[in-house]
Amino acid sequence: MAEEYKNTVPEQETPKVATEESSAPEIKERGMFDFLKKKEEVKPQETTTLASEFEHKTQISEPESFVAKHEEEEHKPTLLEQLHQKHEEEEENKPSLLDKLHRSNSSSSSSSDEEGEDGEKKKKEKKKKIVEGDHVKTVEEENQGVMDRIKEKFPLGEKPGGDDVPVVTTMPAPHSVEDHKPEEEEKKGFMDKIKEKLPGHSKKPEDSQVVNTTPLVETATPIADIPEEKKGFMDKIKEKLPGYHAKTTGEEEKKEKVSD
């Protein structure tokens, strides 16, 4: 019985201790002034684990294309490096002084060869021209000999008449002044005819000057009557005006006395 009791006692005591430990953290969490206490420091192992996990996640989340672009941008040369490379390439491609001299010598030798060929061609052409000139001279001498023979046949070395063709030069005839005179006379005659038809414009003939004086007198009389008619019309208007009648009567009486 005693052994059974011993076995049962520790079984009952052990859960009591566990209950006390489990209740202790619950009381701490429910405390009102726990925020004033210092926070528990995180261990360094935990920080390293968190950082490694974060890096692993970021590496998985980043796409491969973005990583490749980033690496290319890092490896790209700067503007200064590009300019330096271009300058080096230009200097490498530039020919040296020896190359330039070699090229100039080769070009001068080729030009001299061409000049030599041209000189030979010119000499050959000159020879051909000289030969052709001699041939032309011989032909001219033959022609001159034929012409001399023809001249010997004719007296005094005259050429046949068929060789010389007379050249006739025709000059345009100048316009004569006399051609314009009949037109002027015709115009004058026409104007004279018109003037003869008008009264008072008849010409005086050279022989009978006294006979043509009568129409001049006849034409003068109607011309003198025109101002009298005008004066009479004006006098009639003036007579109608008041204060002008007395003056006109006195003037008329004076005119009648003078006429008598």
From Swiss-Prot:
Residues 1-187, 197-216, 240-260 are annotated as: Disordered. InterPro entries: Dehydrin, Dehydrin_CS. Induction: By dehydration, cold stress and abscisic acid (ABA). Induction by dehydration occurs after 1 hour and increases to a maximum after 10 hours. Cold stress induction peaks at 1 hour and 5 hours after start of cold exposure. Residues 184-247 are annotated as: 2 X 21 AA repeats, Lys-rich. It holds the Pfam family Dehydrin. Residues 26-44, 67-102, 130-140, 148-162, 176-187, 197-207 have a biased composition (Basic and acidic residues). The modification Phosphoserine is found at residue 61. The modification N-acetylalanine is found at residue 2. In stems, cauline leaves, roots and flowers. Low levels found in maturing seeds. Absent in dry seeds. One of its GO terms (biological process) is response to water deprivation. It comes from the Eukaryota. One of its GO terms (cellular component) is nucleus. One of its GO terms (molecular function) is protein folding chaperone. Sequence repeats lie at residues 184-204, 227-247. Keywords: Acetylation, Phosphoprotein, Repeat, Stress response. Belongs to the plant dehydrin family. This is Dehydrin ERD10. The gene is ERD10.
